[in-house]
Amino acid sequence: MESIFHEKQEGSLCAQHCLNNLLQGEYFSPVELSSIAHQLDEEERLRMAEGGVTSEDYRTFLQQPSGNMDDSGFFSIQVISNALKVWGLELILFNSPEYQRLRIDPINERSFICNYKEHWFTVRKLGKQWFNLNSLLTGPELISDTYLALFLAQLQQEGYSIFVVKGDLPDCEADQLLQMIKVQQMHRPKLIGEELAHLKEQSALKADLERVLEAADGSGIFDEDEDDLQRALAISRQEIDMEDEEADLRRAIQLSMQGSSRSMCENSPQTSSPDLSSEELRRRREAYFEKQQQQQQEVDRPGPLSYPRERPTTSSGGRRSDQGGDAVSEEDMLRAAVTMSLETAKDNLKAERKK
């Protein structure tokens, strides 16, 4: 592909690019094409003068600008046709009745010149392959034999005029090289405007990225991924909620213990300790159950006589009655303490929730 001559668009000099891409070299310049255009203008003036230099048509012709060129660099089909005659080449309209009667397969031709409004470009066969040498492209575009007819038909549908170039084109390096090898094109060339827009977009994105990196370096904070940031925030919120729940639970337990302590102080005998911890309550319950078991064992154990030994009613009986009273009072006290502890914990927790 590097051996193919391809002039890219400059201004409105597409006619010059079309001819040079066709001939595969810098054969024509704007000055040479302008000279051909002036010759055509002079020939047209002479023909108009044949009707009389004083005629209205002649004066109108002189006032009109040239139809073969303009200041932008545009050149007419007549200029292109005359330029090709220097090389013995001729242009024939592709869709003319004369050419269509010949029924020539497009792949058997050597080159085409295509025109739409003021734009010209060449489609040429180099070696055994066809190439679109449009100067608006960033490079030559490979066209397969099967796609060539469809490509030309598409151009006609879009309003292009297509001319067949007849004659022997000058030899060129690309044609000789591609006679021996075939090229493959992995990526089609883009239009120059698209390439410039793509480069500008990349430049803008690069500038934005650099600004973001500079800002990140200045602040010391850079979030590589927005999703990671959202997940981190969600986890942080969950941890805060868990901490709040744990704090509520600790306050409820503390209030429960305070309430149970107050209840036990109010309901316990004055001889007991003013503050009973949970450990003390547990020890008292164990002592109560052990005493109950010992009493049951004494009742069930048989004595040396068939009747139980009598005991003084005043002392021993009084002591047994006191022990039973102490046991009952301790049992009631434990039950009441546990019940009041649970109720107090519930009430305190509800009050804390309302706050």
Swiss-Prot record:
Q: Would you say which domain of life the source belongs to? A: Eukaryota
- Composition bias, Polar residues: 257-275
Cross-referenced InterPro entries: Ataxin-3 (IPR033865), Josephin (IPR006155), UIM_dom (IPR003903)
- Active site, per annotation: C14, H119, N134
Membrane topology listed for this record? Peripheral membrane protein
Q: Where is this cross-link: Glycyl lysine isopeptide (Lys-Gly) (interchain with G-Cter in ubiquitin)?
A: K200
- Can you locate the Peptide (Met-Gly) (interchain with G-Cter in ubiquitin) cross-link? M1
Where is it mainly found?
nucleus
Question: Which Gene3D superfamilies does the record associate with it?
Answer: 3.90.70.40, S15/NS1, RNA-binding (1.10.287.10)
Q: Which PROSITE patterns match?
A: JOSEPHIN (PS50957), UIM (PS50330)
What does the record list as GO biological process? actin cytoskeleton organization; cellular response to amino acid starvation; cellular response to heat; cellular response to misfolded protein; exploration behavior; intermediate filament cytoskeleton organization; microtubule cytoskeleton organization; monoubiquitinated protein deubiquitination
Give UniProt keywords alphabetically.
Hydrolase, Isopeptide bond, Lysosome, Membrane, Nucleus, Phosphoprotein, Protease, Repeat, Thiol protease, Transcription, Transcription regulation, Ubl conjugation, Ubl conjugation pathway
Q: Which Pfam families match?
A: Josephin, SUIM_assoc, UIM
Q: Please report the stretch or stretches of sequence annotated as the Josephin domain.
A: 1-180
Q: Which PANTHER family match?
A: ATAXIN-3-RELATED
* Free-text comment on this protein's domains from its UniProt entry: The UIM domains bind ubiquitin and interact with various E3 ubiquitin-protein ligase, such as STUB1/CHIP. They are essential to limit the length of ubiquitin chains.
Tell me, how does this one assemble?
Interacts with STUB1/CHIP (when monoubiquitinated). Interacts with DNA repair proteins RAD23A and RAD23B. Interacts with BECN1 (via its poly-Gln domain). Interacts with PRKN, UBR2, VCP and tubulin.
What is the name attached to this protein's record? Ataxin-3
Q: What is the lineage of its organism?
A: Eukaryota, Metazoa, Chordata, Craniata, Vertebrata
